[in-house]
């Protein structure tokens, strides 16, 4: 497939890669992006340092209503069985209209581990964070207002098994294309060398 070749081509520049991702059909984009392994994700995260800065609207487009959920399908590079590397991050805009998003992680083990709630905000004004990505998915914070109907109950990430996965963690996000973002995980300000890709579902 053309897109799979583009993602594997280490000589391909960021603009050409973004064009290939944007040109693909939704099913082609999902299939190719969710097949990316650790080495490729690491390379793409570094490549995306030169990308146009992300905005919150890349996760929840401006035309979406408050508390309307937007699904992003994902694959991570954690040392887990294959099926557990696939997940969803679900985002929504709060009623207040403040420059932040609420979200949680829908995983095969969400009932066992917990939802991993977060607040996503721009990193502008945070000199230590800005070079890592323009948006941070911050697990130190959880929603403090209403979330979409049907989402799990909001609980802090210090509770239960979540402490092993989400507690004291932040994900720093970069843009690959209109629908595709890539993130790097940090624990207590330490880079974990773990990455994940997201494909927004429209």
Region annotations inferred by a language model:
Residues 1-202:
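Soluble ligand-binding/transfer domains with enclosed cavities or grooves
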């Amino acid at each position: 497939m053309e897109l799979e070749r583009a993602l594997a081509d280490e000589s391909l520049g960021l603009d050409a890669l973004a064009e290939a991702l944007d040109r693909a059909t939704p099913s082609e984009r999902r299939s190719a992006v969710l097949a990316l392994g650790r080495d490729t994700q690491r390379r793409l995260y570094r490549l995306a340092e030169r990308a146009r800065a992300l905005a919150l609207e890349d996760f929840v487009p401006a035309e979406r209503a408050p508390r309307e959920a937007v699904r992003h399908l994902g694959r991570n590079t954690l040392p887990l069985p294959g099926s557990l590397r696939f997940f969803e991050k679900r985002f929504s805009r709060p009623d207040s209209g403040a420059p932040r998003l609420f979200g949680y992680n829908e995983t095969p083990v969400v009932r066992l581990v917990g939802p991993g709630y977060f607040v996503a905000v721009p990193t502008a004004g945070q000199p230590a964070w800005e070079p890592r990505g323009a948006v941070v998915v911050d697990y130190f914070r959880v929603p403090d207002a209403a979330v979409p109907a049907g989402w799990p109950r909001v609980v802090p990430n210090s509770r239960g098994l979540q402490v092993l996965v989400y507690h004291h963690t932040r994900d720093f996000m970069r843009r690959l294309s209109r629908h595709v973002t890539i993130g790097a995980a940090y624990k207590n300000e330490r880079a974990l060398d773990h990455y994940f890709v997201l494909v927004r579902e429209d």
